Every structure is written in C-alpha cells, then in structure tokens.
C-alpha cells in the first residue's frame, strides 16, 4: 500500500508544499474530464489523507458519472508505517474513532462510499498474504457483481458480497483486522460506513451498501447511484446522436425511439419499476 507517512497528518497539505500530495492530486486530476477519460468508478487504495479523499469525491461529483471508493484514516497501520507488531498496529478503539472522524467531515455525497475494516488477501502469483485497504475488496465486489448480475444489483450480502476464498472480491480474502459484532455493524452503518463482517458459516462478507449521502433518499444506496450513473451515460450517448438537429417532432421521436427500448430493457432486468 501507499506509504501514507510521507503525507503529514495535518489538513494543510497542498500541491505546493508536499510532493507526495501533489503527485496524487495530479493523478486524480487526470481523470476529472469525462470527455477525456471514460470510467464509472474512482479509488486510490490506501490513501487516507482527508484532502485527497475529498478530491476523489469532488471529481466524481463534478463528472456526475462515477462513484468514488475511499479509505478512512485510523483503521490500521501497515508495516510500512509502523514497525510494531500486528496487534499494536490495529488500533483498539479505532471503530469509534473512525466513525467520529467521518462525521466530523460532514460529508453528504451519493458519489462516494467507504468500508471497514482492512482485509487480508493472498497474492495469486506468490501465494504470500498481505493486508489491503477495504477499498480493494469493494472494487472487486463491484466488478464481480456487475459481471454476475447487473450494475444496479446491490454488491453486498451473501450472494454478491461474499469475500472468502472463491468469493466476490476476485481474489481470496482470508482475514480482517477486526471481527465486527452486530452492534459494531449497526454503529458503522448508521455512519454510512459499510461493514465487512465475519460469519461462522458464510465467512467474510461485505454487509452494507450505503453511499456517503447522509440525507435520506434512494441515492443513499450504492446500487441506486450506480443505476443512475449507467442510465445517464447511456441516455447521454443517445442524445449526442441528435445534437444540433432541428428541434422538431421528428427529432424527438428519434430520441424516444432509442431511449424507450433502453429503459424498457433496464426495467425487464429489474432495474426500474416504471419510467
């Protein structure tokens, strides 16, 4: 993972006073133009600096067609950050601290999401085990869920969110830095943090799909936001085909003759009830 220690722990980092901050900020900026880069998701795994994760969310919101998957500070310190043993690097009171820190940021965006805690994965090439930020598992689950069903199906639960060997992340997830109780899961979910839970029979499972939108609405769910991103992209492509054409009934009919079948297809595949 990225060595976050090269970034100071204050919130005063800028492109001009920290080379690492500038490097990552520039990398994020390379995908800010939707006409230049096609994507539907953005993440910088392992980077927990609040200014940079906010930049990820801002880029996704400004584009209006991507979901940002961010990591949060205080969950776990990898060996690149701390030479102490594993138990010391896992902060005993981290859950409450992470929840409090996220609430203090006053985020309210349906274009972002976050997960807890870190996961242990097995390198498929070397067989070695390593700890990875939760965004890594989440991204894999999004991809496998979309491949197995549709982008508007929730990438969570035992069917589409199972992370244990052969599971949804696309690579074996063998452990977590912290096993969550039912009360822990409730605390995280109320703070719009998606828990990665461990169950005796089912193993390790992503057990939530909230966005970082605090305002209650359908868009506080990941699958709804991804549905809207999908529809917006497809409708935009249809609309581009009639750009600058005459504003007459024949043009409107050309648009609806393509848009209606698209929406009907989404409805048939359980993405919409009506349109």
Regions found by a protein language model. Give the residues of each.
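Structured, hydrophobic secondary-structure cores that serve as assembly/anchoring elements
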Residues: 1-275
């Amino acid at each position: 993972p990225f060595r976050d220690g090269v970034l100071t722990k204050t919130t005063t980092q800028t492109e001009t006073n920290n080379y690492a901050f500038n490097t990552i900020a520039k990398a994020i900026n390379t995908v800010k133009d939707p006409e230049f880069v096609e994507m539907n998701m953005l993440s910088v795994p392992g980077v927990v600096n609040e200014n940079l994760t906010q930049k990820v969310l801002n880029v996704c919101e400004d584009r209006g067609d991507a979901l940002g998957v961010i990591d949060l500070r205080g969950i776990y310190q990898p060996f690149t950050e701390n030479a102490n043993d594993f138990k010391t690097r896992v902060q005993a009171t981290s859950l409450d601290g992470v929840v409090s820190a996220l609430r203090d940021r006053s985020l309210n965006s349906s274009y972002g999401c976050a997960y807890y805690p870190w996961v242990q994965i097995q390198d498929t090439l070397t067989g070695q085990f390593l700890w990875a930020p939760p965004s890594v598992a989440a991204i894999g689950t999004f991809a496998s869920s979309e491949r197995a069903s549709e982008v508007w199906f929730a990438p969570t639960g035992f069917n589409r969110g199972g992370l244990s060997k052969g599971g949804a992340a696309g690579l074996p997830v063998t452990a977590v830095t912290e096993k969550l109780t039912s009360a822990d899961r409730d605390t995280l979910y109320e703070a719009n943090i998606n828990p990665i839970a461990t169950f005796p029979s089912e193993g390790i499972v992503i057990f939530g799909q909230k966005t970082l939108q605090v305002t209650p609405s359908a868009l506080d769910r990941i699958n709804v936001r991804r549905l809207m991103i999908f529809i917006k992209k497809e409708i935009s492509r249809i609309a581009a085909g009639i750009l600058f054409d005459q504003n007459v009934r024949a043009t409107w009919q050309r648009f609806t003759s393509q848009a209606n079948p698209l929406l009907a297809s989404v409805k048939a595949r359980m993405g919409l009830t009506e349109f």
